[in-house]
Amino acid sequence: MNTMYVMMAQILRSHLIKATVIPNRVKMLPYFGIIRNRMMSTHKSKKKIREYYRLLNVEEGCSADEVRESFHKLAKQYHPDSGSNTADSATFIRIEKAYRKVLSHVIEQTNASQSKGEEEEDVEKFKYKTPQHRHYLSFEGIGFGTPTQREKHYRQFRADRAAEQVMEYQKQKLQSQYFPDSVIVKNIRQSKQQKITQAIERLVEDLIQESMAKGDFDNLSGKGKPLKKFSDCSYIDPMTHNLNRILIDNGYQPEWILKQKEISDTIEQLREAILVSRKKLGNPMTPTEKKQWNHVCEQFQENIRKLNKRINDFNLIVPILTRQKVHFDAQKEIVRAQKIYETLIKTKEVTDRNPNNLDQGEGEKTPEIKKGFLNWMNLWKFIKIRSF
């Protein structure tokens, strides 16, 4: 009876083992199938992506701008409404699909690389770093490597330092033994230099006292008044005031003053040059002279443009807003030169109509000469007013 129970127990045990083990194996088969299907789908998707890249004529790893540019070129060729000989709606649909897939793939790769780079930066950021100023606290920070090696280097360093100190001591001892007067000579030189300096100061003081006794300082302007060391403005630093005074006394000027003078001289030269160019041409001008005049005006406009750039630089450095300058208008300057030329022509015509009459004697002027002189004076005043 016991034998039968034992056999039944063994049979039941075998059935239970099979019931627990075999289904797990059976369950594992679909899992391997899923992995295989996923690997195949991943392979197929990579193959499709490569096909999309090939269809768009771009390489893997390209940027989104390159993908868009390639799509625009292909769309111009295959779009049904493009009117080209290669227009094909089916091809364009495939190209558009490839464009969307490739663009999304490129964006995903870019985002993945950026996130990976940010993670690496965060890791590097929060990673513990030993401060650069922290050295080994033992052995005076001498040496490198293991503690034993650092100790060995430190011993060598101490031996070298001791040898140098001994050499320096022996050197000083020999110097004091064979050159006992060297320190005395050095002290004598310093004392002589000090005596010479004091002698010069005493000489200058004696000369000043002698001049005061003679009365050379009696009639000086500002006698009995406090020295005016600084300017009236209390906000200026005394050091700045002294530096400015030294620069002014030595002929130096601030940069903005030099630029202001340069701008004034340049515009005066340009006005004079265009007026001289207009005088060389006839009145009225021939077609050839008109071409020459147009060329002169173009060159004048270019010079005015360069001058306006210098005015911009001047306005940036000038310390006072009221000192800033406005741009010069080339057309207004050309019209001004024309008016001055016309005034000169009219003045010349008046002078030619009323020739000088010098028969009345020396030092006597006719009304015509006075009138011509007044016209020239008015013209000169007009030129000066227009230039400022």
UniProtKB/Swiss-Prot annotation:
Residue list for modification Phosphothreonine: 347
Keyword Phosphoprotein on entry: yes
Coiled-coil parts of chain: 261-349
InterPro entries per UniProt: DnaJ_C_subfamily_28, DnaJ_domain, DnaJ_homolog_subfam-C_membr-28, J_dom_sf
Pfam families: DJC28_CD, DnaJ
Domain J: 51-115
Keywords, ordered alphabetically: Chaperone, Coiled coil, Phosphoprotein
Record's keyword annotation contains Coiled coil: yes
Organs and tissues of expression: Expressed in the fetal and adult brain, testis, uterus, spleen and liver.
SMART domains listed in its UniProt record: DnaJ
Signal peptide span: none
Function: May have a role in protein folding or as a chaperone.
Official protein name in the record: DnaJ homolog subfamily C member 28
